[in-house]
């Protein structure tokens, strides 16, 4: 089992296995395979140590992955909250950020329903 960027990759096609790394999509994985001159249909366990080293070097040099990427995203959200912009306020309140409706739906972002007492007749 190969280990790249602190992630154990399963024995699948290279282009699929690389997507197990946070920050690498299918298209990024294909690009990495092309730059490393590796067939994306090849299995991870079939790669030599030299080929794995080339893939590691490409990822380290050109991509922000795993911890570095998670930290950057968290800092971007924190910056939005600190400057008090609309998106930052929505993050702070735990509401949808990108303009979705909230009268109904938005349960994923808002969490479990809170029961409100009904109006007396």
Curated annotation (Swiss-Prot):
Q: Record's GO cellular component, any one? A: small ribosomal subunit
For this entry, the protein name equals: Small ribosomal subunit protein uS13
Report the leader peptide range: none
Q: From the UniProt entry, list the residue stretches annotated as the region Disordered.
A: 94-121
Subunit structure of this entry? Part of the 30S ribosomal subunit. Forms a loose heterodimer with protein S19. Forms two bridges to the 50S subunit in the 70S ribosome.
Q: Which gene encodes it?
A: rpsM
Entry keywords, A to Z: Ribonucleoprotein, Ribosomal protein, RNA-binding, rRNA-binding, tRNA-binding
- A Pfam family of this chain: Ribosomal_S13
Which GO BP terms, alphabetically? translation
One example of the protein's molecular function in GO is: tRNA binding
Q: Which family does it belong to?
A: Belongs to the universal ribosomal protein uS13 family.
Query: NCBIfam families under this entry?
Result: uS13_bact
**What function is annotated for this protein?**
Located at the top of the head of the 30S subunit, it contacts several helices of the 16S rRNA. In the 70S ribosome it contacts the 23S rRNA (bridge B1a) and protein L5 of the 50S subunit (bridge B1b), connecting the 2 subunits; these bridges are implicated in subunit movement. Contacts the tRNAs in the A and P-sites.
PANTHER family, per this entry?
30S RIBOSOMAL PROTEIN S13/40S RIBOSOMAL PROTEIN S18 (PTHR10871), SMALL RIBOSOMAL SUBUNIT PROTEIN US13M (PTHR10871:SF1)
Keyword Transferase set for record:
no
């Amino acid at each position: 089992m190969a280990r790249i960027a602190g992630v154990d990759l399963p024995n699948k096609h290279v282009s699929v296995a690389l997507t197990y790394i946070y920050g690498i999509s299918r298209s990024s994985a294909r690009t990495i395979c092309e730059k490393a001159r590796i067939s994306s249909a090849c299995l991870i366990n079939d790669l030599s140590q030299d080929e794995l080293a080339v893939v590691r070097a490409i990822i380290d040099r050109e991509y922000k992955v795993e911890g570095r990427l998670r930290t950057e995203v968290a800092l971007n959200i924190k910056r939005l909250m600190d400057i008090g912009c609309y998106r930052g306020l929505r993050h702070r309140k735990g509401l949808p950020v990108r303009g979705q409706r909230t009268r109904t739906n938005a349960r994923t972002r808002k969490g479990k329903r809170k029961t409100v007492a009904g109006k007396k007749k």
